[in-house]
From Swiss-Prot:
Domain of life: Bacteria
Family annotation (PROSITE patterns): VOC
UniProt protein name: Uncharacterized protein PA2024
Source organism (scientific name): Pseudomonas aeruginosa (strain ATCC 15692 / DSM 22644 / CIP 104116 / JCM 14847 / LMG 12228 / 1C / PRS 101 / PAO1)
PANTHER family linked: CADMIUM-INDUCED PROTEIN CADI
Pfam families in the record: Glyoxalase
Every VOC domain range: 4-127
Signal peptide as annotated in the record: none
Record-linked Gene3D superfamilies: 2,3-Dihydroxybiphenyl 1,2-Dioxygenase, domain 1 (3.10.180.10)
GO biological process: response to cadmium ion
Family annotation (InterPro entries): Cadmium-induced_rsp (IPR052393), Glyas_Bleomycin-R_OHBP_Dase (IPR029068), Glyas_Fos-R_dOase_dom (IPR004360), VOC (IPR037523)
């Protein structure tokens, strides 16, 4: 078997705020909690993806201070441009919108970006050749 990416592990300054962010904006759910080294370790996953890919989040990290033109991010696919616009509106109301919706040439597509409570950027896109529903799109 070749290596398979199964998780990303992140230390975050405010565990509860990060859980709420990923539940609210990404549709992820806590699937596991346990004590760990004087704190708590939490696993989060998208419904149906629990055994494929998870975020492991733990308290204790420092906030990331990324520049607005730093494109380091986690990427999530959405079902339509309207879904990107709706999510961007909700993020703007919550004060976490970093990149307003914009169009880029293929394979980037239509996307917006949010800042999670730890300072990580999270992209929400439509029209990329990645994720559910993209099987008919060519890989560039």
């Amino acid at each position: 078997m070749s290596p398979t990416l199964t998780h990303l592990a992140l230390h975050v300054p405010d565990l509860d705020a990060c859980i709420a962010f990923y539940e609210t904006f990404c549709g992820m759910r806590v699937i596991h909690r346990r004590p760990g080294k004087g704190s708590q370790i939490v696993w989060m996953a998208e419904p149906g993806q629990e055994q494929r890919f998870i975020f492991v989040i733990m308290p204790g990290g420092q906030p990331r201070n990324l520049a607005s033109d730093d494109y380091s991010h986690f990427g999530f696919a959405l079902s339509s441009r309207a879904a990107v616009d709706d999510l961007a509106r909700r993020a703007e109301a919550a004060g976490c919108l970093v990149w307003a919706p914009r169009d880029e040439p293929y394979p980037v597509g239509y996307y917006c970006g949010l800042r999670d409570p730890a300072g990580n950027y999270v992209e929400f896109s439509y029209g990329q050749p990645l994720g559910p529903g993209s099987e008919a799109l060519p890989i560039p």
